[in-house]
C-alpha cells in the first residue's frame, strides 16, 4: 500500500520549532495546481506559512539528517530494534507487537475493570521508575527513539520496557 498523501511535523525541525508539511503524489498535486495562477490552492489561512525561524530550523535539521547519515543509520538499526521489540512477545498481557523502522506498537490486554488502565500504569511506571518516555493510545504502547539511538540504547530501552510490562501484568 502506498499513501496518496503524507503529513509530517515534529521531525522536520527536531521538535525545536513548530513546523509541518504535506507530501502528495504527483497526480494529486497536479489536480490542485490546475487552477489559475492567482487562485490559492488548499487555502486555509497560512498564519505561519514560511515562517523564517521554522524554515531555518527545518533546513538545519534536513542538513543534519543528510550530513550525519541518520536515515541510513536508522535503516541499519531496524533489525536490532525489531528483534528487541519482538523479544517482548510472551510477556504477561502482551497481545501483539508491530514494528516499522524504529517505531513499535505494543498492544496490551485490557484490565476487566477499566480499558486503558494497564497502558496508563505502564506509562507512569516507565517514566517514574525507569526514566523512559512512552506514548499510549488506549491499551497500546507506542515508542520511537531518536534517530541517533545506539544498539546498546535499544537494548536498554527494551530491558526497561520489559520490566514495566511485567510490573503491570
What do these predicted regions represent?
Residues 1-169:
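Conserved N-terminal phosphate-binding loop of PLP-dependent enzymes in the Aspartate aminotransferase
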Amino acid at each position: 500500500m502506498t499513501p496518496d498523501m503524507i503529513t509530517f511535523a515534529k521531525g522536520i525541525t527536531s521538535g525545536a520549532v513548530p513546523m509541518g508539511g504535506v507530501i502528495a503524489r504527483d497526480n494529486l498535486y497536479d489536480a490542485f495546481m490546475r487552477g489559475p495562477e492567482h487562485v490559492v490552492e488548499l487555502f486555509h489561512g497560512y498564519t505561519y506559512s514560511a515562517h523564517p525561524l521554522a524554515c531555518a530550523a527545518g533546513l538545519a535539521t534536513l542538513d543534519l539528517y543528510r550530513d550525519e547519515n541518520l536515515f541510513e543509520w536508522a535503516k541499519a538499526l531496524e533489525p536490532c530494534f525489531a528483534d528487541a521489540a519482538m523479544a517482548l512477545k510472551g510477556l504477561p498481557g502482551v497481545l501483539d507487537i508491530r514494528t516499522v523502522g524504529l517505531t513499535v506498537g505494543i498492544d496490551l490486554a485490557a484490565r476487566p475493570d477499566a480499558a486503558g488502565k494497564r497502558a496508563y500504569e505502564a506509562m507512569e511506571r516507565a517514566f517514574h521508575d525507569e526514566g523512559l518516555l512512552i506514548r499510549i493510545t488506549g491499551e497500546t504502547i507506542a515508542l520511537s527513539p531518536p534517530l541517533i539511538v545506539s544498539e546498546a540504547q535499544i537494548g536498554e530501552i527494551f530491558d526497561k520496557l520489559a520490566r514495566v510490562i511485567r510490573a503491570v501484568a
